[in-house]
Amino acid sequence: MHTTVTRFAASAVAALLLLIAGAKANACTTAIVSARASSTGRPMIWKQRDADNVRNTLAHVKGERYSYTGIFADTDTGHRKTYGGINEAGFAIANNLSYNLRPDDTGTQNGLLMSRALGICESLEDFENMLREGTGLEISANFAVIDAHGGAAYFEAWDHGYTRYDVPEGGVLYRTNFSLSGRENEGGGYARYEAISRIMEKRPRGGYSPEFFLDAARNFHHGFSGKDALKGNALVYDNHLIPRPWSASSVIIEGVTQAQRPDAGMMWFVPGYPPCSYAVAAWVAAGDNLPATVSGDAPANALAVELMHKVHPFFQNEEGAEYLDVKAVKKILPVVRKAEKAELREARQTDGFNPAEVLGYNKACEERFEAFKQKVTR
């Protein structure tokens, strides 16, 4: 089911369309999983973030009404623009830029809107009211939203209107860089949309899990050809795959059920290029008690950027930046997956409401990262 609300008539067809399918950055992939479709009974949002600034950090922010944990660019020291997060009321949001909604450009203030929403919203209805009343911001995005009341929906929104698509009970939805309500055959991310469609069709028997999306973040199948880039050892053009040279992070946000405390949400955050980095846990209830590897200067992100350059040997060359050294990434992936398996195991044994346990997890997380760094760089 979807609902369209337009506050003003849209302008004529675009004179300028920026960053379409061949774009170098700002081309994310997202999915929403309803509570009944997940392996944990919690609703989830997944976001593979692509950006020109590939350095991210986690931070816990005190909003106008609610505190929240979110992803920020390392240059955003004031934490004004989040690219995905969850608050203490169980409200979570992430986005894809959409390139077929606005008539002239892409809308550059989506991060400001998401920070504002995380600070004041408890429900999908709160967020919808924000959009209906007008935000005063230049936006153009597919906003993935879940709440603690069982709500889950995409809002395909721009400055002067939005269309809401509710996730079917027991179902899933996903988006790339075009909106279903936008201008037909415009926008970007069509190859990735085909790829994530094929991935999501293979629904696991026990439901979608964080591990499912961590695998998706490192899935090298081309959406149009179906070809798996990892089958060979040559250089391959990877700009239209889910993991792109501009992939800056991946995150799985686990929301809460109506039987849980609203601040029971958590995030599995992969800093930097996902094939060269692994997921680390952060709990909303833990506040600013975050792992040092992914907050502040985020050394795990810095390492992932270094490794991304290693597997893209011509990255500094404009023509060569989007060519992946398959042989090199295949050497790194097993080390990443082994480290991630251990990290998930340790996190799941940690009580996110217990400050001492979280502190212990964070300290051990640093030690595990140092061991990973030694293995992956030698």
PLM-predicted stretches and their roles:
Residues N129-A144:
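Secretory/export targeting leaders with adjacent low-complexity proregions
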Residues A27-G85, A89-G119, A141, D147-R378:
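C-terminal, well-structured catalytic/ligand-binding subdomain of enzymes
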